[in-house]
Swiss-Prot record:
Function text: Involved in oxygen transport from the lung to the various peripheral tissues.
Gene3D superfamilies recorded: Globins
Protein name, per record: Hemoglobin subunit alpha
Modification type Phosphothreonine: residues: 8, 108, 134, 137
Sites bearing Phosphoserine, chain numbering: 3, 35, 49, 102, 124, 131, 138
Organism: Semnopithecus entellus (Northern plains gray langur)
Residue list for modification Phosphotyrosine: 24
Signal peptide start-end: none
Residue positions where N6-succinyllysine is found in the record: 7, 11, 16, 40
Family (UniProt): Belongs to the globin family.
Sequence positions that bind heme b: 87
A cellular component term, taken from the record's GO annotations: haptoglobin-hemoglobin complex
Single GO molecular function: haptoglobin binding
Amino acid sequence: VLSPADKTNVKAAWGKVGGHGGEYGAEALERMFLSFPTTKTYFPHFDLSHGSAQVKGHGKKVADALTNAVAHVDDMPHALSALSDLHAHKLRVDPVNFKLLSHCLLVTLAAHLPAEFTPAVHASLDKFLASVSTVLTSKYR
């Protein structure tokens, strides 16, 4: 459960992402594909090379979903319901992959926002991404 301090940290950190969300989302996806090659199996129709328009497009979708989650941090299950349905029923993404992408997002944010990425912010973002992952996998049951 996110504390009020966690919510403040997440909103402040995500606010610093600004217009770079799509770029950071794409970078996190590239990190995931390189570090965890089995995740590529969910994107057989994508050009997964560095700078690919498809990876950039999906990175923007990831960032937009996280922006939505930040904006609705007190009601993420409702805000992410359609996305949860999509990943559970149509795409059938293995839930472990959300943890892998979350890790890669944390690394990407730490690399781009070193001054803002304090231990407290790191912990808050980790809890937030774990909450998002929980919501996205809730329809698997």
